[in-house]
A protein has these predicted regions:
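Short glycine-/acidic-enriched loop or helix-start segments at secondary-structure transitions
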Residues: 34, 140-141, 197
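Mobile active-site "lid"/loop adjacent to the S-adenosyl-L-methionine
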Residues: 134-167
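Conserved Class I SAM-dependent methyltransferase catalytic core
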Residues: 159-208
Length: 208
């Protein structure tokens, strides 16, 4: 859980404006979204808030949190496949769509090609991403055989070239790829991603 003082600080810096779309890909109880709405004194469009979580109870609490703070129109979805927003993204109509792993004949969404869709649907890009995802060595992702194709949709998974990866790294790429051009992002991550040698690929990728 992110302390409210930190959330307040981050929202003040990012400073969401009217007509901007906002997402928390690991929404929890939607504190980032609710604080953004409250701080705007209701001037932000309540239809422009989006969130995803793997826990149905969290999504219920998030929806209630937004409602109690005056936003009854936020789009907050549960994706209880254990992957949440790692695999599921919003399309431009506000519906969840899944990444498509490569096949022998098609690259599909392999290695960050998330806009390469044969179904004609377009990935929704957001003006603002605010999130505090799971991260750290204890929260490493070790994809099973079924999920490996999804992992390969992430360029950083392929760059790291290991059998496991810090979830914070995956959620970092996830946040960047759903961010609109000239958008603003705030993500709470471990200091290690910004400093230690084993995460140099993440830093290099982010600066490219």
């Amino acid at each position: 859980i992110t302390p409210l003082q930190i959330i307040d600080f981050i929202v003040d810096i990012v400073n969401p404006k009217n007509n901007e779309t906002i997402i928390d890909p690991t929404v929890g109880i939607a504190d980032f979204l609710s604080v953004s709405y409250v701080k705007s004194n209701g001037t932000l469009d309540d239809k422009n808030f989006y969130g995803v979580d793997i826990d149905e109870d969290m999504v219920k609490l998030a929806t209630l949190n937004m409602l109690l703070n005056g936003d009854g129109n936020a789009t907050i979805e549960v994706q209880s496949d254990g992957l949440g927003s790692i695999n599921s993204k919003f399309d431009d109509e506000g519906n969840l769509i899944k990444l498509v792993p490569r096949t022998e004949k098609q690259e599909h969404n392999y290695n960050g090609l998330w806009d390469n869709r044969v179904d004609g649907k377009q990935l929704k890009k957001f003006d603002i991403v605010l999130t505090n995802p799971p991260f750290g060595e204890a929260r490493s992702w070790v994809p099973n055989t079924t999920d490996l194709g999804i992992a390969e949709c992430y360029e950083l998974w392929n760059r790291y070239g290991q059998t496991k990866i810090d979830l914070g790294v995956i959620f970092l790429e996830n946040a960047v790829r759903v961010l609109a051009d000239n958008g603003r992002m705030a993500i709470v991550l471990s200091n290690s991603i910004a400093s230690i040698a084993s995460h140099k690929e993440a830093r290099k990728w982010l600066c490219e």
